[in-house]
Amino acid sequence: MNTLLATVITGLITDENKDFYFIQKDGFTFALSKSEGEHHIGEMVKGFAYTDMQQKARLTTKETFATRDHYGWGTVTEVRKDLGVFLDTGLPDKQVVVSLDVLPELKELWPKKGDRLYVFLDVDKKDRLWALPADPEVFQRMATPAYNNMQNQNWPAIVYRLKLSGTFVYLPENNMLGFIHPSERYSEPRLGQVLDARVIGFREVDRTLNLSLKPRSFEMLENDAQMILTYLESNGGFMTLNDKSSPEEIKATFGISKGQFKKALGGLMKAKKIKQDQLGTELL
């Protein structure tokens, strides 16, 4: 087992060819691409040691986001249901795998392409690199306390823990932690998913934020109105429902209350999108 892998080392350039310099360190040889800069035989070079997609020992002088000793963010590039997810952690010619063994049991909650995971690297007995997601304690140590003056603000939030009690997230732009109760979302977010979350409260006990994925009340009105417009457009521009219809009919058709329905109709009439009569509602 090569114990130098997934660490930063300093080695001696002992040979080269058209494409690579070859660096020696403790009896191991690592190839450094000449595209990363000009060097000379006999020179000492510092870089990150790893194995590429062909399992060949490589060295890179480029910045890497995660090592054995340091956590860093990786971006999901591919998902394989039989293996896990592949991450870009900044390594040339290398995507590091997060094994299915450490991913959620429900594959619907696995990260998708473009999602982000906070990981460190590990090496197995066959010199294969694996990425391991950070434990919740890592985020708790890393994050700063939230403030009690952020009500109704929207922030990007990355999902780092999934529990029955709710979704735990990290806010990268202000280095804070948040929690989303199941009642404040329409569906369960994926691990690593980047969300647009709104602050709805503050937990004094641990200085974290309570967040919601649901729209504000005025945004819900807009969404209801758009839903009604879409329904009218797909039904020939007319529906038998109007503001005199029963709450049961409205709920069965749109899944909203009569109060929400009437507000949405009022907004659409004010915008001159529809008209109502005793027969129903018509698109203008």
What is each stretch, according to the model?
Residues 1-284:
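Single-stranded RNA-binding regions, centering on S1/OB-family and related RNA-binding modules
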